[in-house]
């Protein structure tokens, strides 16, 4: 298959500062304890209005008033996820005054009670996802086909990783694999992608926190007669509880991130698990408005704008390596971004 992977052009996606900034309005907006804490919370993740009400124990009308002030000052953005509206901090160039205001603001942590409420919200999100997968493992493959069949993106994920592995060996001046290479797939589903990738690695590991999902994947592996699956291991593990041992060369998450309670926490964990110059590859939905994805497939997020994924990656030391977009199907468009863990190069003396 001829390569369709385009290197990512960082210059065209740099944060841009508005032509006119109302610094007075920004300063006034930040100069309120509750609004300052809202911005601190939004530095961690995106939250819905009712989630922010819970975090700060504030009634919805009052909180909406504060959010309006922050948005009018240009300090926050909002996006719709089905019937819910989520807020996040606006992005500014690193050397800009608003970025300096955010940095100063973040020197003071969120109050302990608010942090505890944030953890409660993450737990609720995770339980919602876990409950769906536990109760729908037997029909999820069929329902996922209605959103995006795996055969749509698998060839591109395989190609992305093959090119990365080849360039890594070339950069290290290797003619063959000398070290043990390990792949981790998060939420392997029916294990079709895992089986397609396994031949590129010494070890291919798939993890899921749902035993019913693992059982379904194991059944599919046992019936797979076209691929060598001897080096594949399936493990019942929580992605966020894996030891931070930087032991994986490549991490793959295909149609998984939109189920995660916190995209930012996902990227933080990936950073801890990847080896130097390791690769994260996502197959993920672009933003959409089809609420049926939540009921059919248990989606928490209705896709992601590429710049949102790039911001999460950059915050956690991951650099965009390539970006692909596949043709729209069933009303959904798939993106396949890859991110490389940036490591400092030793200085030559």
What are these regions, as identified by a protein language model?
Residues 264-279:
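A short glycine-rich, Lys/Arg-flanked "PGG" loop and its adjoining helix->strand segment in the class I
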Residues 148-179:
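Conserved alpha-helix/loop element of class I SAM-dependent methyltransferases that forms part
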Residues 184-241:
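Class I SAM-dependent methyltransferase SAM/SAH-binding core
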Residues 21-62, 85-92:
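N-terminal helix-turn-helix DNA-binding core of bacterial DNA-binding proteins
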Residues 5-9, 96-142:
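Amphipathic alpha-helical dimerization/coiled-coil segments
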Residues 240-251:
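A short acidic, Gly/Pro-enriched loop at the edge of an enzyme's catalytic core
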Residues 279-338:
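C-terminal alpha-helical "lid/dimerization" subdomain adjacent to the S-adenosyl-L-methionine
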């Amino acid at each position: 298959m001829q390569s369709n992977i385009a290197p990512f052009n960082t210059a065209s996606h740099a944060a841009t500062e508005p032509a006119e900034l109302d610094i007075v309005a920004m300063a006034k907006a930040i100069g309120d304890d509750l609004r300052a804490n809202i911005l601190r919370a939004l530095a961690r993740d995106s939250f819905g209005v009712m989630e922010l009400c819970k975090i700060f124990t504030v009634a919805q009308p009052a909180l909406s008033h504060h959010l309006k002030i922050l948005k009018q000052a240009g300090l926050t953005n909002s996006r719709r996820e089905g019937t819910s509206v989520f807020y996040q901090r606006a992005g500014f160039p690193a050397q800009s005054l608003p970025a300096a205001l955010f940095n100063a603001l973040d020197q003071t942590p969120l109050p302990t009670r608010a942090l505890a409420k944030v953890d409660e919200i993450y737990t609720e999100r995770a339980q919602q996802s876990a409950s769906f997968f536990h109760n729908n493992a037997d029909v999820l493959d069929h329902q996922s086909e209605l959103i995006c069949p795996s055969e749509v993106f698998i060839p591109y994920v395989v190609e992305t990783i093959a090119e990365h592995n080849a360039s890594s060996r070339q950069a290290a001046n290797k003619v063959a694999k000398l070290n043990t290479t390990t792949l981790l797939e998060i939420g392997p589903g029916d294990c079709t992608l895992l089986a397609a990738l396994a031949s590129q690695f010494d070890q291919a590991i798939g993890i899921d926190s749902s035993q019913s999902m693992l059982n379904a994947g194991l059944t599919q592996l046992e019936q797979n007669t076209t691929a060598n699956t001897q080096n594949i291991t399936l493990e019942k593990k929580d992605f966020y509880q894996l030891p931070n041992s930087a032991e994986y060369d490549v991490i793959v998450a295909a149609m998984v991130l939109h189920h995660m309670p916190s995209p930012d926490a996902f990227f933080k964990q990936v950073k801890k698990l990847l080896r130097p110059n390791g690769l994260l590859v996502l197959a993920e939905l672009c933003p959409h408005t089809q609420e049926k994805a939540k009921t059919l497939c248990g989606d928490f997020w209705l896709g992601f704008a590429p710049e949102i994924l790039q911001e999460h990656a950059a915050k956690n030391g991951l650099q965009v390596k390539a970006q692909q977009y596949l043709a729209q199907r069933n009303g959904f468009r798939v993106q396949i971004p890859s991110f490389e863990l940036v490591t400092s190069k030793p200085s030559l003396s």
